[in-house]
């Protein structure tokens, strides 16, 4: 970090992201998941560096991925910590941003007494946060229910638990015997850039047909 810090402010942003290991590593270089103590050390070092960069250049420059805080068992920083959210694509600040945007959107809603019950498939890592956010909406929408399913990633295996790498067959296998109520919502981040297929070449239609339900693909702003 300090070597890169010499090039600030030309070096504008650095993301510290734990290695993601699939279950298919035969013959590859031996890597392992970080231990909680190691993740905590990484966060401490990044924060010390960030405070100095903030003093010198007005920006922390280095930010740890949300996953590092989860591994370390430490609370995530709040919204203001992440400045311009330059590293969202690397999983840095996504939790703080989602909490802020959800609270903002909820504050502008009047609420209603309509009844509905849908299901939502997501990665295992995101499921607890989504359930937490939904609890905050109950006062305004007491009769609207959304059951969140954190889908284990069988395709990639290992420690892969992010939503964007969940495949169609993972969803089908995990939800085959579970209640889906009025339909299943899928985040579009699960789909390739063309928004028509999962990484395993299955489609939302395949999921709908296999699970005998209606599938709704929700955009990043939905």
Q: What do the PLM-derived regions correspond to, one by one?
A:
Residues 1-27, 37-67:
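Conserved C-terminal portion of the radical SAM core fold
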Residues 72-222:
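Radical SAM enzyme core and accessory elements
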Residues 1, 29-38, 77-80, 200-202:
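Short secondary-structure boundary/capping segments
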Residues 1, 13-35, 119-124, 149-161:
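Conserved strand-turn element in the central/C-terminal portion of the radical SAM core barrel
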């Amino acid at each position: 970090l300090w070597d890169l810090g010499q090039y600030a402010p030309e070096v504008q942003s650095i993301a510290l992201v734990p290695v993601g290991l699939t279950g298919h590593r035969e013959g590859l270089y031996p890597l392992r998941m970080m231990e909680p103590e190691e993740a905590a050390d990484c966060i401490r070092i990044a924060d010390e560096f960030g405070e100095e960069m903030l003093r010198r250049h007005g920006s922390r420059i280095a930010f740890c991925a949300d996953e590092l805080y989860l591994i370390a068992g430490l609370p995530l920083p709040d919204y203001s910590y992440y400045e311009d959210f330059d590293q969202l694509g690397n999983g840095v600040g996504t939790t703080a941003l989602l909490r802020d945007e959800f609270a903002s959107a909820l504050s502008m809603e009047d609420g209603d007494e309509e009844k509905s019950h849908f299901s939502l498939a997501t990665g295992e890592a995101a499921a607890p946060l989504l359930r937490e956010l939904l609890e905050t909406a109950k006062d305004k929408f007491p009769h609207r229910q959304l059951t969140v399913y954190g889908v284990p990633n069988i395709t990639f295996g290992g420690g892969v638990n992010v939503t964007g790498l969940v495949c169609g067959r993972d969803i089908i296998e995990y939800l085959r015997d579970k209640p889906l109520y009025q339909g299943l919502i899928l985040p579009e981040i699960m789909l390739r850039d063309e928004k028509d297929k999962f990484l395993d070449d299955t489609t939302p239609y395949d999921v709908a047909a296999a699970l005998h339900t209606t599938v709704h693909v929700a955009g990043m702003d939905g």
